[in-house]
Regions:
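Short beta-strand/loop motif that positions the catalytic acidic residue
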Residues: 48-50
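A conserved short beta-strand
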Residues: 23-35, 45
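Acidic catalytic loop of the alpha/beta-hydrolase fold
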Residues: 53-57, 83-84
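C-terminal catalytic histidine-bearing segment of alpha/beta-hydrolase fold enzymes
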Residues: 73-118
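Short, proline-enriched alpha-helix->beta-strand connector loops that line the catalytic pocket
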Residues: 40-46, 69-73
Length: 118
């Protein structure tokens, strides 16, 4: 099985790429991201993950573009998680205050990917 994934703008670009190569992938992981490409009629397994304290992800756009994903897209909200903790670059300007440690959010994310990619 092949999955594509990305964080923030990288997630949007991953979704765009997958939309043009949909037959080559089994699924897509979006981390604090949304897809402007229409994948709604695809058979992809799509997982959307973001933190409850994310201050960077534009939730209005996230909701607006939700219809571009398959109906059975699974959404996982990391309680206390933030935008910056999907990467290793420090806290991003405008992000919320996380209620979990960086290592904890990374571990939850890895566990989620591992469990759902079986």
């Amino acid at each position: 099985e092949w999955y594509m994934g990305g964080h923030s703008l990288g997630g949007a670009m991953a979704a765009e790429y997958v939309s043009k190569h949909v037959d080559e992938f089994d699924g897509l992981y979006l981390f604090a991201a949304y897809s402007t490409a229409d994948l709604s009629d695809s058979d992809l397994r799509v997982f959307s993950v973001y933190g409850s304290e994310d201050g960077v992800l534009d939730m209005d756009k996230y909701r607006k573009y939700r219809s571009n994903l398959p109906e059975d897209t699974y959404e996982y909200v990391i309680d206390g998680g933030c935008h910056s903790y999907f990467g290793s670059y420090g806290l991003q300007k405008g992000d919320g205050t996380p209620d979990v440690a960086f290592e904890e959010q990374i571990e939850m994310t890895v566990d989620f990917i591992t469990y759902n990619s079986k």
